[in-house]
Every structure is written in C-alpha cells, then in structure tokens.
From Swiss-Prot:
This is Regulatory protein RecX. Keywords: Cytoplasm. Modulates RecA activity. It comes from Clostridium beijerinckii (strain ATCC 51743 / NCIMB 8052). Its main location: cytoplasm. Belongs to the RecX family. Disulfide bonds: none annotated. GO terms for biological process: regulation of DNA repair. PANTHER family: REGULATORY PROTEIN RECX FAMILY PROTEIN. GO terms for cellular component: cytoplasm. Signal peptide: none annotated. It comes from the Bacteria. It is found in: Cytoplasm.
C-alpha cells in the first residue's frame, strides 16, 4: 500500500494537481477530483483506490472534451462519440460522458433532427435529409417520425423554386425541352426529392414557362 507524500498544484495549470506516492511523482489529476475524493497527504492508497482514481480522471477529462465538442455547434450522439474515440478515450469513459450530456440535454437526437429538418428543407428534399441524418447516426425511427410531420406541399413549393432557378440557367444554353427536363430531373433527384415530387415539379416549371411565353 502506497502513502500519499505530496499533493502539488501545477504551476502552469492551477486546475491540475501532481500526486507523489512514497516520495516519488506518480501521476497528475484534476484538482476537482482531489477535493471530491478527499485526498490528503500521508493518507494510504491501495491499488483499488488508484484504479478508481484513474477511471474517475479519465471520465472527467473525457467529459471536458465532450463539452468542448458541443460548445460551438449542436451535435448528434454519434458525432460526439466518434470525436471522443479519435481522442482515444476508453469506451467506459465515453459511455459515461454521453450519459452526462444526455442527462442535461446537451445532446438530444430528437431535437437535433427537428432542427436539422427545419433548416435543410430550404435547400434539399426529404430523401437527402434522411440519408444525411442516417450518416450522422440518427436512428431511422426518429427520422421517419419527424418526416411524417413534413408539409408535403411546402416541400413541393421549395422544390419548385429550386427547379425554377435551375431552369432559368439551363434554358440559356439548351433549347431542347426533352434535354432540359432530363437535366432538371437529375438535378432535383440529386437534391433529395423523390421521383413523384420531381416529376410534378418539372411539369409545373415547364408549364409555367409555356404560359409566360
């Protein structure tokens, strides 16, 4: 069993503390953990206590990293996990950090999905939105539930505006209506609109142009 012979606050980082066991430097931990665990000079530390300290320290560092990750932009659970794994934190610490973030609603895949859909509907179709969210680690059930509430007519209106702008660019270089329709079709599909919406929108765009003419 080792004895705690010195607890030294680091000069460059007052939130970190160096621990000395039996007269020799052992490792450093956060000052918060020293107070939390009531560590004192001359106290005896058994191997189990050392292991617990190491685990607690890893978790605290992992949690701090997780908070920095979400500091500027809202993230999905998968995005946070992936970034923590890149920093080589152990799975147990990552799980605890994620649990902490969820507890205080710092990450919420349901809320993220709502915000993402509302924002991206102005520039892409529901299929691309779904694919993008799946890649971000959002479960299919959450995505499908939110997309069910989607205003289909609003999606068509947005698709029409996008298609109209593209059409105005294409018709300056192309006069063949069949080729124009083909280019519009591929463009809208690439934007994530399904075949039904795409076909309806193209017909409307072409019809509007004929009426204007």
């Amino acid at each position: 069993m080792a004895k705690m012979t010195k607890i030294e606050i680091q000069k460059r980082n007052k939130e970190r503390v160096n621990l000395f066991l039996d007269g020799e430097y052992a490792f450093s931990i956060s000052a918060e953990l020293v107070y939390k665990e009531s560590l004192k000079v001359n106290s005896e530390i058994n191997p189990e206590k050392l292991r617990t300290l190491a685990e607690s320290e890893n978790f605290m560092r992992c949690k701090e990293s997780a908070l920095r990750i979400i500091e500027k932009t809202y993230k999905t659970e998968k995005e946070v996990r992936d970034k923590l794994k890149l920093k080589e934190y152990d799975e147990s610490s990552i799980d605890k950090a994620i649990e902490f973030l969820k507890k205080y609603n710092f990450i919420n895949d349901g809320n993220y999905t709502k915000i993402f859909i509302k924002d991206k509907l102005r520039s892409m179709g529901s299929q691309k939105i779904k694919y993008t969210l799946l890649r971000k680690g959002i479960c299919k059930e959450i995505i499908d539930e939110e997309l069910l509430n989607l205003d289909k007519e609003n999606e068509k209106d947005v698709a029409f505006d996008i298609a109209q702008k593209k059409y105005n660019l294409i018709k300056n270089k192309e006069t063949d209506t069949y080729k124009i329709s083909g280019k519009l079709y591929r463009y809208l599909i690439s934007k994530g609109y399904n075949t039904e919406v795409t076909s309806q929108v193209i017909k409307k765009v072409m019809a509007v142009d004929v009426d204007d003419f």
